[in-house]
């Protein structure tokens, strides 16, 4: 028996009501926590997905949060394609706001993964992705290799492949390069049905038994 619990942190009603311009769209981005349970073991893996939320949204979430476990994570998806706006919205690439420190400190153990769903992160323009953001994220990881970039993590025939994370009773595992036949079949069916889509930079995928969550979508019967 496996199940998925989804907690919606944002957008907030007042932010939606105040958003009038195209430039306001990041203020109403969806921020979610996925909590995966398996075989009677609750919350084996938690994933925090930040959409395009900038630091103001994260501060709003922190100000209103009443349960720290709803912000805990084993997998963190970098907001806004690894944009610096999670840390600060100025040109000062050395000043990290407390909101970013607080969210990143919610990592549950040393095996946490941070995933940038973005183009390859280079120390050059245009951006995002911001190279400085990548540097800050990696500072928070004991294993620097646990920072994954969808554009380059797995490439076959010059095409970025989806990052596939499998949740087992011992936690989350990166199975990008060695999906089982059953998992590959389920993934292919999800793509065929249109439930999942792969961008040119690759997609972020999670599977629990037959279930696969990718880029905020959920596929499966369990």
Model-found features: residue ranges?
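Active-site-proximal loop/helix segments of hydrolase catalytic cores
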Residues: 12-110, 114-125
